């Protein structure tokens, strides 16, 4: 501990408390302000755009100081949290009047980006997650906690790519990682990074902490006991949550394991390329969520986004969702359910604040309003067979609703410290104290009248302020007429203020009554928490059910408004879509969207898609993935009909840009994403590949594109949409069974081009690249020059086209002869020999000898 003897007592206290939390900002309460000193002051001044001043000297040096008013602190905290900062709140807990030295202070809570629960500090319609990651060799454990709902989950990742995908799904507000974590490239761009000591990830400690929290002997009931790496991460996360909240966390009642086998897996590139909740620019406009999310409650909106990012594979559960949506549509219940659900509000987060005992008076009135909707909602859902499963978990809570109706006034003040929250008639003693305090108005009016009459001073009036209490005010012109027993309390420019014994006695009596009323009111407010907490688990289950009902009602409204249909699930591998539409693009276009079919099945697994730039290839592929994903959410889809078979993963390799932060070129990004697909995809995967091989030479790119397509078609047998400008690949259907050509066409006339956007069988005839360049505004002289060059190149190309195709076919035959794609039982001897050879070190004679030797091995 540093020596603080050279400092004043107050600064000693500050520095001692600051030493306990050196890495975060300390808001140190002094009267009506939270003050910051030294480096904290400099940092806060820069981040919050507040004045940096100085406070005297300590240890012979000026002390940098910055401060914010206590009554406006939430706005400043919100800004700091958004910037990824954490703040320790240090309050005065001692009585200034009874303190000989500095008033006793202590840290009452630590506000961090991942543990906030105050509604002013939280993004309303997205989850705010605290996440911890733990690494053991090449495997990873993850834990996530939503402090504002109590949802606590763990998962395990078999490799760095899966970890990246999970972090992309979770989008943590704050991320804890161990000191020995080695994959920093994955997490270094995350806000709110917190490095934690290795011992916090110890398994035994984690299990002990979690059992104590849940009141269990072991974790078998939660199905997580074998997820060791996930539990290690959970232990660190839970310790951090306890450390920052400094109170019990009764709303965290369970922990669950996220199983990859239960969900359709989406890697990080797929989540980004499909623009599920964020567009490619990082905004929320023109995303799938922006189209689908018309939920009337914030908690419903958050749940819908979880469904979007984590589509499920349990067909029974999916059909239940579909049936509920269909029932809501059939009985025309949208207009009945949504007004009631809108009144429910954000019950989930209110309950978290109740659990933490930080709920404000208006939280309790909103909870009361939510509970008041339950009888009507129950009446509606009990009449429909497909909705009755929601009835029991929703509950009614008539007693709690009655408690809140009796206890809290209709429009309470913002904070309990303002008083006037508890309703009249709820508590007799409180009513008595209030009556005494409120009687001051009539008494003061009578006293003012008497004093005017007795003194003859017509400007005399009685007033009150927080500094001087009650006073008698007389104008300066008549102050000389004040009686002798008037004791001067304050002199103003135009008036004098006095006190008399009778008024002082009454002031003491009123202030005592107000103080007693406020103290009793705070006590009663805490007792309301005591009565709510035993029902917390049931209330949380109710809020989850209401959020689900909101999502399903919302999806019904979207299906009706946007003309969606219910997809069918088939046990047969494939994706068949009749007149499918892109759910986002069709909302943005001013002209009608051109719907297109998709047919993928065991006999037609890979479609080679050709056509012009801007012709709609990328849109066609994305809409196929989005329709599939929407089906596995349990919602309806934009098509005339959709039959979806088993899908375990969705991969996309669409578009790319340089990853400057990691020092990777466009081509390197493409190849990294492609490598992930080739390693991870299965026969049940849906794969979208767009323009692979563009970032290198023509022959390199063509070779890579051919090899990737062949691997997908023959080895992986994934359901694949493969868009390309390499027309040489249109011969693939001649080479491999299960492969077909489709194209999108355009019409060119008088230097203009019209894109048809309709998918047709067969290969495209040309790419229309020059017409697109002209549309983009490339100067006509350049276009003219390009056309001349194109004519020359096409003439040369025509002469060698047959030879090029023959070369590709020959290459394919050679690959077959070399058994390049034989079963994974090891490489043959010829390939092993080739791998060991260094051509640069061979003489011509040695090379010829090796060639003969290789010939004998084939």
From Swiss-Prot:
GO molecular function ontology, one term from the record: damaged DNA binding
Entry-linked SMART domains: MUTSac (SM00534), MUTSd (SM00533)
CDD domains per record: ABC_MutS1
Binding annotation for ATP: 611-618
GO cellular component: cytosol
The keyword DNA damage belongs to this UniProt entry's keyword annotation: yes
GO BP term (any one): mismatch repair
Annotated NCBIfam families: mutS1, PRK05399.1
Family the entry assigns: Belongs to the DNA mismatch repair MutS family.
Protein name as it appears in the record: DNA mismatch repair protein MutS
């Amino acid at each position: 501990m540093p020596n603080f003897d050279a400092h004043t007592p107050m600064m000693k206290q500050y520095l001692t408390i600051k030493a306990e939390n050196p890495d975060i900002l300390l808001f140190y309460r002094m009267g009506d302000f939270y003050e910051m000193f030294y480096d904290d002051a400099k940092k806060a001044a820069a981040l919050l755009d507040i004045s940096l001043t100085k406070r005297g000297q300590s240890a012979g040096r000026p002390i940098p100081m910055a401060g914010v008013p206590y009554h406006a602190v939430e706005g400043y905290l919100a800004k700091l949290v958004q910037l990824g900062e954490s703040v320790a709140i240090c309050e005065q807990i001692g009585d200034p009047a009874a303190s000989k030295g500095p008033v006793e202070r202590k840290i009452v809570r630590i506000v961090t980006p991942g543990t906030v629960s105050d509604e002013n500090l939280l993004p309303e319609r997205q989850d705010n997650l605290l996440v911890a990651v733990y690494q053991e060799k090449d495997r990873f454990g993850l834990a996530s906690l939503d402090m504002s709902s109590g949802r606590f989950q763990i998962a395990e990742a078999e490799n760095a790519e899966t970890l990246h995908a999970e972090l992309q799904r979770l989008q943590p507000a704050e991320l804890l990682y161990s000191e020995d974590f080695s994959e920093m490239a994955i997490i270094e761009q995350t806000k709110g990074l917190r490095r934690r000591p290795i011992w916090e990830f110890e398994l035994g400690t984690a299990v002990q902490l979690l059992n104590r929290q849940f009141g269990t002997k072991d974790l078998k009931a939660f199905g997580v006991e074998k997820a060791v790496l996930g539990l290690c991460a959970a232990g660190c996360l839970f310790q951090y949550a306890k450390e920052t909240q400094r109170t019990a966390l009764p709303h965290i009642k369970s922990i669950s394991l996220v199983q990859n086998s239960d969900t359709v897996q989406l890697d990080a590139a797929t989540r980004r390329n499909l623009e599920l909740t964020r567009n490619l620019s990082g905004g929320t406009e023109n995303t799938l969520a922006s189209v689908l999310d018309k939920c009337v409650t914030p908690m419903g909106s958050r749940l819908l986004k979880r469904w979007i990012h984590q589509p499920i594979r349990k067909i029974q559960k999916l059909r239940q969702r579909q049936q509920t949506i269909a029932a809501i549509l059939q009985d025309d219940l949208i207009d009945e359910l949504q007004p009631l659900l809108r009144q429910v509000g954000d019950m989930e987060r209110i309950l978290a604040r109740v659990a933490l005992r930080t709920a404000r008076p208006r939280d309790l009135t909103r909870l009361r309003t939510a509970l008041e909707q339950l009888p009507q909602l129950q009446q509606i859902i009990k009449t429909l067979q497909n909705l009755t499963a929601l009835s029991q978990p929703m509950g009614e809570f008539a007693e709690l609703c009655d408690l809140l109706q009796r206890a809290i006034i209709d429009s309470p003040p913002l904070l309990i410290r303002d008083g006037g929250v508890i309703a009249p008639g709820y508590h007799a003693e409180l009513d008595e104290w209030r009556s005494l305090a409120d009687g001051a108005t009539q008494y003061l009016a009578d006293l003012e009248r008497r004093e005017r009459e007795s003194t003859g001073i017509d400007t005399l009036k009685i007033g009150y302020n927080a500094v001087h209490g009650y006073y008698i005010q007389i104008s300066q012109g008549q102050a000389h007429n004040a009686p002798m027993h008037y004791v001067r309390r304050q002199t103003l420019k135009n008036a004098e203020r006095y006190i008399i014994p009778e008024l002082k006695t009454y002031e003491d009596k009123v202030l005592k009554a107000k103080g007693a009323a406020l103290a009793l009111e705070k006590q009663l407010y805490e007792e309301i928490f005591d009565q709510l907490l035993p029902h917390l688990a049931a209330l949380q289950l109710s809020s989850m059910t209401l959020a689900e009902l909101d999502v399903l009602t919302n999806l019904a409204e979207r299906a009706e408004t946007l003309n969606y249909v219910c997809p069918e699930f088939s046990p047969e591998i494939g994706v068949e879509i009749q007149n499918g539409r892109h759910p986002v693009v069709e909302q943005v276009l001013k002209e009608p969207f051109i719907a297109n079919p998709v047919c993928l099945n065991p006999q037609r697994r890979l479609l080679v898609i050709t056509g012009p730039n801007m012709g709609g290839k990328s849109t066609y592929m994305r809409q196929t993935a989005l329709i599939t994903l929407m089906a596995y959410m349990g919602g309806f889809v934009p098509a005339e009909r959709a039959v979806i078979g088993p899908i375990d993963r969705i991969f996309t390799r669409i578009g790319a840009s340089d990853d400057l932060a990691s020092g990777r070129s466009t081509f390197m990004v493409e190849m990294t994403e492609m490598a992930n697909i080739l390693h991870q995809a299965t026969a049940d995967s849906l794969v979208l590949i767009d323009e692979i091989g563009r970032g290198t030479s023509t022959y390199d790119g063509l070779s890579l594109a051919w090899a990737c397509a062949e691997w997908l078609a023959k080895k992986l047998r994934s359901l694949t949409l493969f868009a390309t400008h390499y027309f040489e690949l249109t011969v693939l259907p001649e080479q491999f069974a299960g492969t077909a050509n489709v194209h999108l066409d355009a019409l060119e006339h008088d230097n203009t081009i019209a894109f048809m956007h309709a998918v047709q069988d067969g290969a495209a005839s040309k790419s229309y690249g020059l017409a697109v360049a002209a549309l983009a505004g490339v100067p006509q002289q350049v276009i003219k020059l390009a056309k001349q060059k194109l004519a020359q190149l096409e003439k040369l190309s025509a002469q060698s086209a047959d030879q090029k195709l023959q070369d590709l076919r020959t290459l394919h035959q050679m690959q077959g002869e070399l058994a390049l794609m034989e079963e994974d039982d090891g490489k043959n001897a010829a390939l092993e020999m080739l791998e060991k050879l260094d051509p640069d070190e061979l003489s011509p004679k040695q090379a010829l000898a090796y060639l003969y030797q290789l010939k004998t091995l084939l």
